[in-house]
Amino acid sequence: MAPQPRRLIAPDAREDDAELSLRPLALADFTGQASARANLKVFIEAAKARREALDHVLFWGPPGLGKTTLAQIVARELGVNFRSTSGPVIAKAGDLAAQLTGLEDRDVLFIDEIHRLNPAVEEILYPAMEDFQLDLIIGEGPGARSVKIDLAKFTLIGATTRAGLLTTPLRDRFGIPIRLEYYTVEELECIVRRGARVLSIPIADEGANEIARRARGTPRIAGRLLRRVRDFAAVDGDPEITRAVADRALRLLDVDHIGLDQMDRRFLQTIALSFGGGPVGVETIAAALSEPRDAIEDIIEPYLIQQGFLQRTPRGRMLTSHAFRHLGLAEPPREKTQFQLFSEGGEE
């Protein structure tokens, strides 16, 4: 199968140099996630006052909300070294040992996609997190022996979009679990205006608002949309990004007024037109769209659920009346499922 082109509003797409330049460098410059920022500030100041390593931190939530950025900020605020890797890269115990033995006291090791760690590697990580020791088996067969290696007292920061896939023993070893939430339009406006200042882009408040409304609650997408709108404005000779300029550019980019793109609409239309609005299983949807199940569950569905377009029920995915209205389609009559009857009769 030919590789699919990158969606402009894909929150998990790899960041380029321009996106990296928009990242805030300090907690005070970080917009949004007020509760997470306030708590982190307390934990960081307490650790610095005690001259101890910060307790292990787990950031979890949808992609593009700032998990990596916050991890870097934590290391910078602590005044320590920052080392970064990801779960799939640490294939064997030796890979993990190489990362851990290179750390100094209070350094930060960041593991992105920590839910994808090899189970054998995860077992070795437990004593490293709890006792700051590595338990390695050297050799094979009768001559094999166990070796303990003392480690510096470090801070592990894990990031995941799927906290439910973490094993309980690993999840319980993080003393500071922090869930990141989607951003409000007002917060994204601030992020867009800051990005415009960094990139020297003239932008009106209404233009920033228009981009923020279509950024799906995600700073990474907001920055990407800002740069693409800038391109249209430059080619069209517009001196400033106004609401009209942003609207025209985003319409040409096929991003509608609430941030849905062609893939989102295709997903909704498939359920509406091919499966009568549901319920329909995610595997069936994946086959119909020729998309992997993980992409549907991690990338497409979360925002649609948050916007009230989609329900996950025991029998499968179902579109809401809101989704049919957005698509401009008549909602077909459907028999009430047992799930819906119970939802109407009590708490959801």
Swiss-Prot record:
It comes from the Bacteria. It catalyses: ATP + H2O = ADP + phosphate + H(+). Has 3 domains, the large (RuvB-L) and small ATPase (RuvB-S) domains and the C-terminal head (RuvB-H) domain. The head domain binds DNA, while the ATPase domains jointly bind ATP, ADP or are empty depending on the state of the subunit in the translocation cycle. During a single DNA translocation step the structure of each domain remains the same, but their relative positions change. Residues 257-348 are annotated as: Head domain (RuvB-H). SMART domains: AAA. GO terms for molecular function: ATP binding; ATP hydrolysis activity; four-way junction DNA binding; four-way junction helicase activity. It is found in: Cytoplasm. It comes from Methylocella silvestris (strain DSM 15510 / CIP 108128 / LMG 27833 / NCIMB 13906 / BL2). It holds the Pfam family RuvB_C. Belongs to the RuvB family. This is Holliday junction branch migration complex subunit RuvB. Mg(2+) binds at T68. ATP binds at L22, R23, G64, K67, T68, T69, E130, D131, F132, R173, Y183, R220. Residues 184-254 are annotated as: Small ATPAse domain (RuvB-S). Keywords: ATP-binding, Cytoplasm, DNA damage, DNA recombination, DNA repair, DNA-binding, Hydrolase, Nucleotide-binding. Residues 1-183 are annotated as: Large ATPase domain (RuvB-L). DNA binds at R293, R312, R317. The RuvA-RuvB-RuvC complex processes Holliday junction (HJ) DNA during genetic recombination and DNA repair, while the RuvA-RuvB complex plays an important role in the rescue of blocked DNA replication forks via replication fork reversal (RFR). RuvA specifically binds to HJ cruciform DNA, conferring on it an open structure. The RuvB hexamer acts as an ATP-dependent pump, pulling dsDNA into and through the RuvAB complex. RuvB forms 2 homohexamers on either side of HJ DNA bound by 1 or 2 RuvA tetramers; 4 subunits per hexamer contact DNA at a time. It is an enzyme of class 3 (hydrolase).
